Amino acid sequence: MIWHVQNENFILDSTRIFMKAFHLLLFHGSFIFPECILIFGLILLLMIDSTSDQKDRPWFYFISSTSLVMSITALLFRWKEEPIISFSGNFQTNNFNEIFQFLILLCSTLCIPLSVEYIECTEMAITEFLLFVLTATLGGMFLCGANDLITIFVAPECFSLCSYLLSGYTKRDVRSNEATTKYLLMGGASSSILVHGFSWLYGSSGGEIELQEIVNGLINTQMYNSPGISIALISTTVGIGFKLSPAPFHQWTPDVYEGSPTPVVAFLSVTSKVAASASATRIFDIPFYFSSNEWHLLLEILAILSMILGNLIAITQTSMKRMLAYSSIGQIGYVIIGIIVGDSNDGYASMITYMLFYISMNLGTFARIVSFGLRTGTDNIRDYAGLYTKDPFLALSSALCLLSLGGLPPLAGFFGKLHLFWCGWQAGLYFLVSIGLLTSVVSIYYYLKIIKLLMTGRNQEITPHVRNYRRSPLRSNNSIEWSMTVCVIASTIPGISMNPILAIAQDTLF
């Protein structure tokens, strides 16, 4: 009893220290104030874990979620401030970077309540899980603001190392070990290729590492059309391609999705793409400014392959998580259209808007997979047959998120794709947009196939998993339903109010 009281006093004292540091940073300012909040949250988690017992576990969720919400609040207060380059040019703060940081923080904030019941049922180590999630979030935020080659390399490595550890969190699962090994090997190879490309940029620009200085250096050395820049472009595209996972750099994606814990997959499926998209826009648009035709062609090829292969292979999948893996490959093909269009025709604004909708659609679907998987122990698509008869809320929520992913009106996914394709059409990407429209129709087929299974009412089609389905008595079930409700609302309502969201996204010039 005395020990528990001492723990509570220690927690309160630690919280006071945290709030005092928060107050100092708030009123004295900081270039990386949102990142500092997460760092304080990480330190606080470690301090409490070293002195607490199992009864204090709710504090871990509270501290993690509070750190993320406070970091989002700090970003919102800093909105529309003048762009600042800090840390000797290594880090840049502007609206464009901050909106991507906001998306990453939003992903993490929704993923933590989605993970609570899974962690309790599987008895995963809660502290390490939250530490890896917050550290990966921190790495993604630094990547969004990176302004030189070294930071662009180090920040994703911070994110990637946490991703490897999270994907292999269930060490006794053979599929998880296989997925982690493949993820680690391909991640290491892609990082090596990325560094190789950066070395060509560094040498060709006369030893510059800041993005804008690289452009100036290429002009001074007259190397902007040299073969070295072509090698740098190809190597950089391959390195970034692994993070974005478009075809043909998608080989790790289905295995990691299937073998990793479902909350981890939900986290990685959105944060990695947001961070990599932010980095890709800056790298391609600034250092490779003089090679715009070449990288446009490369990205068009990746987008076409991703949209075709991702959606066609998704039709044949029997595992829900593998289906979403190939679906995500197709989705990143749509996002690449926005990167190619760029800022001239609202390409970045449409990309950011669609990614916001994709976060809600994807996390809402994964919340359903977590909830259903914990009660049935299966991931097979056919085992979802008749779920509506047992859990109408779960089935209807899943149907709305899947319909939004398919791009059916009047849901958010439809308006997001519509604006993305319209921007591509205005930019003259007629073939690319046509492929996007055709593959979107294909994707509707396999989403509707799942919805048909969910809503079936015939007893002969209802699987034993659904017949024995029982809703969880755990209080933490409310956290999954909370995440799912937020995602469903975000997947439907924003479609009616696109203009304010687009206006905010259009104000992200860098």
Curated annotation (Swiss-Prot):
GO cellular component terms given for this protein: chloroplast thylakoid membrane
Residues spanning the membrane: 24-44, 59-79, 99-119, 124-144, 149-169, 183-203, 295-315, 323-343, 347-367, 395-415, 418-438
First-listed, main subcellular location of the protein, grouped into a coarse class: plastid
GO BP, sorted A to Z: ATP synthesis coupled electron transport; photosynthesis, light reaction
Membrane topology: Multi-pass membrane protein
Localisation: Plastid, Chloroplast thylakoid membrane
Documented EC number(s): 7.1.1.-
Keyword hit for NAD: yes
Gene Ontology molecular function: NADH dehydrogenase (ubiquinone) activity; quinone binding
One Pfam family linked to the record: Proton_antipo_M
EC class (word): translocase
Function, as annotated: NDH shuttles electrons from NAD(P)H:plastoquinone, via FMN and iron-sulfur (Fe-S) centers, to quinones in the photosynthetic chain and possibly in a chloroplast respiratory chain. The immediate electron acceptor for the enzyme in this species is believed to be plastoquinone. Couples the redox reaction to proton translocation, and thus conserves the redox energy in a proton gradient.
Entry's family note: Belongs to the complex I subunit 2 family.
Quaternary structure and interacting proteins, as annotated: NDH is composed of at least 16 different subunits, 5 of which are encoded in the nucleus.
Name of the molecule in the record: NAD(P)H-quinone oxidoreductase subunit 2, chloroplastic
